[in-house]
Amino acid sequence: MNSEFQSLPPETQEAVKRTMDTMEPAQTPAEIRETLEGTQKGGVKNSIRNCLTVFQRDPLFRGALRLNLLTEQIDIVKPLGWERTSTTLTDMDMNYLLLYLEENYGLTSEKKVQSAIKIVANENRYHPVRDYLNSLQWDGTERIRYALHHFLGADTDEYTYEALKLFLMGAIRRVFRPGSKFEVMLCLVGGQGAGKSTFFRLLAGRDEWFSDDLKKLDDENVYRKLQGHWIIERSEMIATANAKSIEEIKSFLSRQKETYKVPYETHPADRLRQCVFGGTTNRQDFLPRDRTGNRRFLPVTVYPERAEVHILDDEAAARAYIEQMWAEAMTVYRSGKYKLSFSMEMNRYLNAHQQDFMQEDTQAGMIYAYLEDYTGDRVCSKQLYEEALGNLNSPADWETRAICEIMNTGIAGGIIQGWAAYKSPKRYKKYGSQKGWERVNQAPPEGDGFQEITEEEARQMELPF
């Protein structure tokens, strides 16, 4: 094996060696040519089978073409005799392959060659992240509990440990069982220069398995930007979200697959998700006050001045630490003793903890103030949109939902006192038939409403006339 092969990751080298050990003995082009199906005129038949035979037996190609299950592209994992700058099969590689097959075997059908390449690559498929994780050996030292403090100065409490462990287990589960339900985003909160983005980049193991290029969720190419990546950072995604976009973010995080076709494919296919998402923000109040719950977002504040080391002080040492962290996580994964969710107790803590990161809820305050002075017996969402919030246009669907959430779940999670939703639509003079809320009677005090007092208290309360 030459220097090009030696430059491959160790786990990839081992996978290539194992694949080649299971193959039939290599043959020379002359020997292989004798086994190929011929034409009536004595030539070599341009068939997929003949092309497959060459790719499986020619020493140049044996073990070279592999389908990468992370990128869903075909990789060339060993030298083929020409200069290459990418591990992925390129158009230039195809030109060299076609030239070699034409000169040595008389095979000239590009379509047949491409079909054979896809078949042989699929038979030799591999997953680089799985190979990486399976190659790790844990040294027994606990690191997950202390990693965020070690590099970023975060607290060492149980919540910080559970948040990072949950994120790691979700990432492992996604590569070993693509499409697994996991909708949690670990969010690192702190000032610039703390190393938040670097932490996620090094956490990916290889830089090519990391991406911070997912800028817009409505980009038509957004799904292709997930392909081939394991850890994806979203910087300031939530902090700049409004009520409408936060619903889009939550929906996006909840998806388990994408259905699309890549260029040159004839049929769209389901692409099961293999990635997880990490968030970074400089803003403390980055969470919208979402009354339906922010359970997907796990905020952890970082304090770089308290960190034991800056993550970029010694990148090699940081990578070694993180590699052992993954080895520890793999030990938990293999044991099967984990869940991809928080316990009820930790969820209660999360709900309280998130209050420190929530934005001011101005709309709820405006509606509450309006209702305090309102003398009518019922209200509808459109009325509140215009009269309480001061809007002149018609509300969008997401704005109507936001008002309904305020009325139904109230401020700080409690129903706005004195109002309850009615089931059947009622007619409003200005707004027509609408669902809404009606004033309800407050529960009367216990007893007759009078308080017994002593004779001394009565004398003190006597009027001076």
How does the language model describe each region?
Residues 231-253, 288-293:
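Conserved AAA+/SF3 P-loop NTPase catalytic/coupling segment centered on the Walker-B
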Residues 222-227, 262-280:
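AAA+/SF3 P-loop NTPase mechanochemical coupling elements
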Residues 246-269:
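Conserved catalytic/switch belt of AAA+ P-loop NTPases
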Residues 117-227, 382, 389:
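P-loop NTPase catalytic core of nucleic-acid-dependent motor ATPases
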Residues 238-239, 282-286, 303-308:
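Conserved nucleotide-binding/hydrolysis micro-motifs of P-loop NTPases
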Residues 217, 265, 291, 304-320, ...:
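Positively charged interface segments
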Residues 1-142, 158, 162, 393-398, ...:
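N-terminal nucleic-acid engagement/recognition segments and initiation subdomains in replication
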Residues 271-275, 290-369, 373:
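Phosphate-sensing "switch" segment of ASCE/P-loop ATPases
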